[in-house]
Each structure stands twice: as structure tokens, then as C-alpha cells.
Amino acid sequence: MNKPHLLIDAGNSRIKWALADARRTLVDTGAFGHTRDGGADPDWSALPRPHGAWISNVAGADVAARLDALLDARWPGLPRTTIRSRPAQCGVTNGYTTPDQLGSDRWAGLIGARAAFPGEHLLIATFGTATTLEALRADGRFTGGLIAPGWALMMRALGTHTAQLPTLTTDIASGLLAGAQAEPFQVDTPRSLSAGCLYAQAGLIERAWRDLADAWQAPVRLVLAGGAADDVARALTLPHTRHDALILSGLALIAAEGAAQD
């Protein structure tokens, strides 16, 4: 019986994990917070020993050390691979001038998106601490991307660097806008700040999508992922598809390719 692969996506906000079976299906999933945010360790006690761990880590050395300690405590000696972006892998060609500068999370997400939507031109918008946009052609060529502050970071920056504006979280902002989303302009400061930053996200995406469709002269599927996707989606006027497992799905493909080469 083939052992599953343990997949770990360590982002700046939290850490997601999954077990993938031989068919690259995610059969068990979970998430946990960073130590700095009071996040408890994951409960892996009921999981079988995997073939190995494949890790995308954009959260730094301290998180890498924590993951090593967690893996060693549960499965001593477990092989592990921290992925890096490459010039080409799993049907995706990296268009960055220096391919290894592309974040490993974005690289895995591109691979996952290519597999999820084969033969389609894609604009992939991922909403985390940063909002990232990736342009992926139907033949698997990643032609470039955009990086902007995420919704939460935009609001936090305004609250931190101005004297009279509040510092709002996405939970607070989402609640404020729940009954006011239909109105293009707001009548108090917290809602104005929440909506302004949200529309900045939506405006970036819609401009990028239209520019891409014009440049490629072809239909482009807009794919949304990440924690603020629901809120941003409500501000969009474009059709879109939601997919929240692109990075883990891409890691599953990378793991399967690596295991086949062992």
C-alpha cells in the first residue's frame, strides 16, 4: 500500500497541511496558527506515517525550525523536501527572469491551477497578507504576476500611519459592510475605510483581468483563493471561480513527481 504524502503550506498568516493519497486526492486536511499569534501545535497523533513531507514555506526560518521540530517529534527521521520554484515543473514554465525568486507558494499554486483548469488561460488571485495575481497561459506558461498589499494589510497600514483613522481587522470590516455592500459610498469612517480598501482589491483584479484578456485576445478564467476571497468576490463585477486548495494541490503534484523519481 502506498504511503500518503504530507503537504505543508506555511504562509505568513497561518499554516495549512494535508495528506494526499496515491491519486493526489487530499484525504485529510487542517490548519494551525503561528506561535507569535498563539497558535497551538497541530494534532497529528492519528495520522499514519507518510512517505515524506513536502513543504512550501514563505514564513521564514523560525517557522522552518518549528516545522522540523513538529515533524521530528511525530515521525523521527521523516524525509522532507522544502520546495523552491524552478524554471519548469509539472507542466508549468516559469516566466520570471530569475525563476527561483518566485515564491514557492505562488509556484505550487500555479502548478495546482494548471492541473485544476487544463487548457484554459487563467488569472489567479490569491488573498493573503499580500494579494498576488498570476497570469498563466493555457499551454502552462506563467507570464508574470502582480503583488499588492492584502485587504487586511491595507487597512492596518492606514490605521497605523494616520492619526485619526481606526485600525480594522477583516472580521470587523466584513461585519461593517454586510449591510452596506450595495452602496458605493459609505457614510462613516470605519465603513468608508473598509469599503475603500476592498474596492482597491477588486479594482486591481478587474483591471488586471481586462488587460490580460485584451493582451491575449482570448477568454481568461478568473480564479480566486485565500482568506479574503469571499469579501472581495462580493465587490467584483466579473465572473469568477473559487478554489482554496491550489497550493496544496500543487504540492501533491510536486510530491508525486518527486516520489516517482526516487
Curated annotation (Swiss-Prot):
Biological function: Catalyzes the phosphorylation of pantothenate (Pan), the first step in CoA biosynthesis.
Pathway info: Cofactor biosynthesis; coenzyme A biosynthesis; CoA from (R)-pantothenate: step 1/5
Keyword set, alphabetical order: ATP-binding, Coenzyme A biosynthesis, Cytoplasm, Kinase, Nucleotide-binding, Potassium, Transferase
Cofactor: NH4(+); K(+)
Gene responsible for this protein: coaX
GO BP terms: coenzyme A biosynthetic process
Catalytic activity annotation: (R)-pantothenate + ATP = (R)-4'-phosphopantothenate + ADP + H(+)
The protein's name in its UniProt record: Type III pantothenate kinase
CDD domains: ASKHA_NBD_PanK-III
Binding site for substrate: Y96, G103, S104, D105, R106, T189
Assigned protein family: Belongs to the type III pantothenate kinase family.
Species, as recorded: Burkholderia ambifaria (strain MC40-6)
SUBUNIT field: Homodimer.
Residues annotated to bind ATP: D9, A10, G11, N12, S13, R14, I15, K16, T129
InterPro entries recorded: ATPase_NBD (IPR043129), Type_III_PanK (IPR004619)
Example of a GO MF term: ATP binding
